[in-house]
Amino acid sequence: MQRRIMGIETEFGVTCTFHGHRRLSPDEVARYLFRRVVSWGRSSNVFLRNGARLYLDVGSHPEYATAECDSLIQLVNHDRAGERVLEELLIDAEARLAEEGIGGDIYLFKNNTDSAGNSYGCHENFLVARAGEFSRISDVLLPFLVTRQLICGAGKVLQTPKAATFCLSQRAEHIWEGVSSATTRSRPIINTRDEPHADAEKYRRLHVIVGDSNMAETTTMLKVGSAALVLEMIEAGVSFRDFALDNPIRAIREVSHDVTGKKPVRLAGGRQASALDIQREYHAKAVEHLRNREPDPQVEQVVDLWGRTLDAVEAQDFAKVDTEIDWVIKRKLFQRYQDRHGFDLSDPKIAQLDLAYHDIKRGRGVFDVLQRKGLVKRVTEDETIDDAVENPPQTTRAKLRGDFITAAQAAGRDFTVDWVHLKLNDQAQRTVLCKDPFRSVDERVERLIASM
């Protein structure tokens, strides 16, 4: 499948600092954030005009699920649009707090762990054909995903009883299973719960919940693009060396703690391989695969950055990727800060900087400052992100949903939508079932819109 439907779900961390005596719980802060949403959507679980879903997840975490996308740069634009949507809610909620005499600053973090050690996720979704062997996908994908943090982790300072150490991934410490149907209780790497949000006879949805939330657009593109390419190769019958891991959960932590990528992890049957070895194998296959594939500049960009990142890790010389890979950007930031102020990695100021990197409010978040200074590379533009805030992808089913929502709101009509259903809540209860996520034109939807 060279044209694939993809999407990213991001849970955001919420906190609030108060100027006055009154303090609010995270639940109350989340309710302030969603008050505007509830006022027009009558719920804290809504679909937006751009085809995305916005809702309040378990544990007061706002979650934004992008609309269905079929290209990487389109997906990065819609992922960034989620930050803008949440930032608008934040500004609105702060204004309401001020009006009610509760002075406070609300912070939304696009990260994966809070100070209390709780974890929340960034989930990638890939449409796969029902016909393939799902177990083969899992077997080949698992070693790739366990070691992928080497090229696209968000980076984190981990405080241990002995000392503070810099790790590649925020999520690695919180993953407890390889493949499972649960998402919160056990946190697997690949979630197998079968909800395709499409024609179930034709498709499955691969739900990857091991990735970090990325701030750098190039890292997001590499994270999703490399996984999509490995999937494509599995579907094309490319054979891979057997890197079955002895213990994926131990391996994911060991890889996260080793920025050299060279420490061996145990494979099944007593063999060993390093994260670098494993990633090199997948990358080499990708380079080979591109020779026989239709040219695609976005995919070529992914494979190029993938290779350069592995070269940088191997040489421990990061100058060639220190504007493109989140954990490298963050580590460089910490090192400069430590050199300037003589801080140890365990200093609370470093933990503060770690958090501020993920603050999505423009003008305040550290990543935004770096971006404005041209210290991080981009693949989008402000205008294309603004467009993604307002409009759905024009090439997928999201266009049908977005057009329907826009028309129903303009006509003042009551409606209900989810990923596959569009329903007008009138006497006739007319409903259109959209089972093909690749289809952006549908006469039934056009008729439903025309009837409003």
From Swiss-Prot:
- Entry keyword annotation includes Protein transport: no
An example Gene Ontology biological process: proteasomal protein catabolic process
Q: Which residues bind Mg(2+)?
A: E9, Y55, E63
Question: What would you give as a GO molecular function for this chain, any one?
Answer: ligase activity, forming carbon-nitrogen bonds
- Reactions performed catalytically: ATP + [prokaryotic ubiquitin-like protein]-L-glutamate + [protein]-L-lysine = ADP + phosphate + N(6)-([prokaryotic ubiquitin-like protein]-gamma-L-glutamyl)-[protein]-L-lysine
Active site residues per record: D57 (proton acceptor)
Q: What is its EC number?
A: 6.3.1.19
Family annotation (InterPro entries):
Pup_ligase (IPR022279), Pup_ligase/deamidase (IPR004347)
Q: Which UniProt keywords apply?
A: ATP-binding, Ligase, Magnesium, Metal-binding, Nucleotide-binding, Ubl conjugation pathway
Q: What class of enzyme is it?
A: ligase
Q: Specify which residues bind ATP according to the UniProt entry for this protein.
A: R53, T66, W419
Q: Which pathway features in its UniProt record?
A: Protein degradation; proteasomal Pup-dependent pathway; Protein modification; protein pupylation
Q: Which family does it belong to?
A: Belongs to the Pup ligase/Pup deamidase family. Pup-conjugating enzyme subfamily.
- List other remarks: The reaction mechanism probably proceeds via the activation of Pup by phosphorylation of its C-terminal glutamate, which is then subject to nucleophilic attack by the substrate lysine, resulting in an isopeptide bond and the release of phosphate as a good leaving group.
User: What job does the chain carry out?
Assistant: Catalyzes the covalent attachment of the prokaryotic ubiquitin-like protein modifier Pup to the proteasomal substrate proteins, thereby targeting them for proteasomal degradation. This tagging system is termed pupylation. The ligation reaction involves the side-chain carboxylate of the C-terminal glutamate of Pup and the side-chain amino group of a substrate lysine.
Q: What is this protein called?
A: Pup--protein ligase
Query: What is the primary gene name for this protein?
Result: pafA
